[in-house]
Amino acid sequence: LQAWRFACHWVKQTGHVPEITSREQLTRSHKATLMDKNRYMPAEHSSAPAKEPLHSVHTNNLPTLFEQLRISLVVSTYQAGKVILVRADGHVLNTHFRSFTRPMGIAADHTRLTIGGTNTIWYYRNVPAVAPKIEPAGKHDACYLPRRIHVTGDIDIHEMAYDNDDELWIVNTRFACLCTLDGDHSFYPRWRPKFLSALSPEDRCHLNGLAMVGGKPKYVTALGETDAQAGWRANKANGGILMDVDRNQIMLRGLSMPHSPRWYQNKLWILESGQGSLATVDLETQTWRTVAQLPGFTRGIDFYGPLAFIGLSQVREKAIFSDFPLLERLDERTCGVWVVHIETGETIGFLRFESGVQEIFAVQVLAGMRFPELLEWQDEKLSLSYVLPDEALKDVALPPRSASGNQA
């Protein structure tokens, strides 16, 4: 754990994540936890789903790891209709649920949180001044407030990311394109695969994943090279592709349900969901190498230092997924978030959902946030929370406090 204390100190002092850690210390201090089932910790849940009781467990190293790295996670599950904040709370992980309609793509950083659903984009901003006012006092260090909504129509929003100009790019799966938004239109198509003959709401290739490089869209994944309605379903087990956006060229074929391409540490990473694996891509040879195989359908990933935080889903629809390699390898799949060391492929720890959540879509690390809050649209705190420009604050006069201590 000393390596992680150094990492936290380094991040605090320099703002950068160190690329070196003591691999021996890391695996030695955490690996034993994975082998002893009696040492799993039940997670603490708040605002849990009402229809099905939530139960989850985690390896007992994760709360300490989250605290030392000063991170939390935001996770989306469209199946349960929830966005989950995963936070260290003493010796346990707290999974804090908020309700949305089929939330999928997430674009998040220290100042903003943007969530995509089937037909809606929800915009949130972090307002740190609100955090101390949330009970229990002194516990929260960030608070995301809802700011606005954009209605896209049913475009089956998948992954999203902001570019260098703070423009949001969206994987529009139903129309098989990358799009952006403006105030006048449902969406603005910006790019589509060259093998598609038309812009049509037929989910022709199941475009799903987006990797940004240098702050611009660079790589996308799709489940097929097909130009017919839902044509990708005919060869879903190994018809997946990776494309270069700039060149509009297919770089890889033969992938098994690829998702979540990411450019990290000068490498292109990809989740081959049908294999339940994490892989790296060699663009020169147009090949890929498996780094880790995991006990579930891999989808949703983010990185921090030498760690990958990977979403796993159970995939229960055997009629749809019956020919996947993952199902041949495992009779039962797992849902949760797995933490993998990207240099060794070893599992460092995990959060496993045992009821209530069966599918994960997006996983993002919230760096520098230990215990964030996400206010729902009907929260009464929104009525008395005002975010003003700095130049306007000097002219604000607050009313006197009442006898009870509240503002009049």
Task: Please report, for each region that a protein language model flagged, where it lies by residue.
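Blade-loop segments of beta-propeller domains
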Residues: 92-159
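Blade-level signature of beta-propeller repeat domains, shared across WD40, Kelch, NHL, RCC1
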Residues: 345-403
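Short, conserved, GDST-rich strand-edge loop motifs in beta-rich repeat architectures
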Residues: 58-70, 122-134, 220-237, 311-332
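Beta-propeller blade signature
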Residues: 236-246, 326-343
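Asp-box/WD-like beta-propeller blade repeats and closely related beta-sheet repeat scaffolds
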Residues: 134-208
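Beta-rich, blade/repeat-based domains predominating
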Residues: 56-68, 99-111, 150-167, 196-218, ...
